[in-house]
Amino acid sequence: MFIDTVKDPAFWEKVRSDETYRPMIDTLLAEWEKCETAEIAEIPYTVAADFFHSGDRVKGERYFFMRRTALSVSAVLALIYPEERKYFDRMQDFIFATCNEYSWELPAHIPNMIDYIPDDIDLFAAETGFTLAEIYAVFGDRLDPLVKTRIKMEVERRIINPFADYNRKFAWIGYRSNWAAVCGGSVAACFIYLAPERFAEVKPRIDEAINNYLSSFQESGYCLEGIVYWDYGFSFFSSYAQLVSDFTNGEVDYFKMEKVKTIATFARSRRDE
């Protein structure tokens, strides 16, 4: 199982010693140089709201993506080098900062600021929930108790409870695009990691989203969104497919579907060209 592998110290010892992983580690350490000194201050309102006044996405999203990158980089380095406290401490700082954000949704995805609901779920709210839930599952009691509490509380408030409310409508469930896979797979991961006993109640919604996503592909395995969004959507689909297979002891196995095999083969054929 994936979660058992990443919780096993022997796996990370292999990562440290196997030269195959060296390029990945070098990339992470290069990113760390920026993450180590990155500002954790609260995103100013004028920056977050700038999109609604100027249409400029860059200012607000720069803060957003810097935090997500720093969180992920710090988390992986904390697993590779558990004896280096600086990575772990930085990760917890960014976890807390992320939990303190007013919204996990990008401003460009918010219909308007007047009627906005902070627990709406877009691509990046779902991804953020997935990241925090997986950190919770992987690090477990290594996390400070308050950090664990904040993760669980915020993911429940922003992702799990809203999605479990069938009176709430999420348009992306019906999208035949990467949105259905990224949002659906990420939301499902939040349930599996933090509220496994509730996964069955939302599985019909997840199934609908994933089926709509798979229906967006041509017979060749190509999607009309292009190769970049093919990669984006299928990476999240694959993560969910592995997670739900582990969770159901193989009862749900998307990787056995011929269509999924065709989609995966399409990418390989493109890379061989």
Question: Where are these predicted regions, by residue range?
Answer:
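Helix-terminus loop motifs that line ligand-binding clefts
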Residues: 40, 85-120, 217-229
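Non-membrane alpha-helical segments in proteins
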Residues: 65-80, 93-97, 126-137
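Low-complexity, Ser/Thr/Pro/Gly-enriched N-terminal "stalk/linker" regions
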Residues: 2, 6-7, 13-52
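Carbohydrate-active enzyme catalytic cores, enriched for enzymes
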Residues: 239-273
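Alpha-helical scaffold elements that line and support the substrate/ligand-binding pocket
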Residues: 71-74, 78, 187-189, 230-246
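Internal amphipathic alpha-helical repeat/solenoid segments
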Residues: 45-63, 107-118, 168-175
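Alpha-solenoid helical repeat scaffolds
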Residues: 80, 101, 138-142, 193, ...
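Active-site lining segments of carbohydrate-active enzymes
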Residues: 113-228, 236-239
